[in-house]
Amino acid sequence: MTVPKKRTSMSKKRIRKNIWKRKGYWAALKALSLAKSISTGHSKSFFVQQTSNKAAE
């Protein structure tokens, strides 16, 4: 089993953690943007099946 030879410095650990957090931030931002475009009906890349309310009445 491989073991790291030296301890990772605090600054390197902080940099890696911030990169990991930034990836999550951008993923959440894209998901929110897609949800907004779907809810307003302006989505060009996502197709949603429209349901009619007349059948229920």
From Swiss-Prot:
GO terms for biological process: translation. It is found in: Plastid, Chloroplast. Coiled coil: none annotated. It comes from the Eukaryota. GO terms for molecular function: structural constituent of ribosome. The keyword Chloroplast applies. Belongs to the bacterial ribosomal protein bL32 family. GO terms for cellular component: chloroplast; large ribosomal subunit. The keyword Membrane does not apply. InterPro entries: Ribosomal_bL32, Ribosomal_bL32_plant/cyanobact. This is Large ribosomal subunit protein bL32c. Keywords: Chloroplast, Plastid, Ribonucleoprotein, Ribosomal protein.
